[in-house]
Design a protein with these regions (language model features):
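Residue-level signature of outer-membrane beta-barrel architecture
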Residues: 1, 27-29, 43, 60, ...
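Outer-membrane beta-barrel domain signature
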Residues: 10-16, 42-47, 71-75, 112-118, ...
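Outer-membrane beta-barrel proteins
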Residues: 16-19, 48-50, 79-81, 97, ...
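Outer-membrane beta-barrel "beta-signal"
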Residues: 127-133, 163-177
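Transmembrane beta-strand segments that form the barrel wall of outer-membrane beta-barrel proteins
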Residues: 1-13, 35-45, 65-76, 100-110
Length: 177
């Protein structure tokens, strides 16, 4: 059994504020040689009201060495969604690693306050080049990400004057201890 704290965020340089900030506290238990079941809580601080979700999911290593993370979320208001993340790492050396990622989110109910429509919400594809330091505990990275919104979520974004598709340069660090 292990407990993990996962945090990811998007910082808008022009606005000098976080666009999104997602925090998860999960407990994981092995269910097979390559997969863990997990349960926990997720706390989001998007543009608009904060959201708290219960989380159930699985994470592990699929055939062909793809890392997979699939989660089901239910908010205290009953809004539910699912997310699947897949990542493949290509090792150039023991320290230089290129990661290709694909994330997809589906909402089972609409939440207009945070701009989420029912159905396929968004996909995000990306490439990150990182350099593992200090026994892989600290890994700075640079990369590029393409994000696209679909269906009702795209309609809500357009109504607010936003776009449905964007490219981002990313820089950050992966920290594990």
């Amino acid at each position: 059994f292990k407990v993990r704290l996962l945090t990811t965020g998007e910082y808008e340089i022009e606005e000098q504020a976080y666009e999104t900030l997602e925090n998860q506290l999960v407990g994981q238990i092995p269910i097979s040689k390559f997969f863990d079941a997990k349960a926990g809580v997720r706390f989001d601080t998007p543009e608009g009201p904060d959201r708290t979700y219960a989380l159930l999911g699985i994470a592990g290593l699929a055939p062909q060495w793809f890392e997979v993370d699939a989660n089901l979320y239910v908010s205290k208001d009953g809004d539910s969604s699912a997310e699947i993340d897949a990542e493949y790492e290509l090792l150039f050396t023991n320290y230089w690693i290129l990661s290709a990622t694909l994330d997809a989110t589906v909402a089972f109910s609409e939440d207009e306050e945070i701009g989420v429509g029912k159905g396929l919400v968004s996909t995000e594809t990306g490439l990150r080049l990182r350099y593992d330091l200090i026994d892989r505990a600290f890994s700075p990275y640079v990369g590029v990400v393409h994000e696209r919104k679909y269906g009702d979520t795209a309609d809500l974004a357009k109504a607010e004057g936003g776009g449905t598709e964007d490219w981002f340069a990313v820089i950050g660090a992966r920290i594990a201890f």
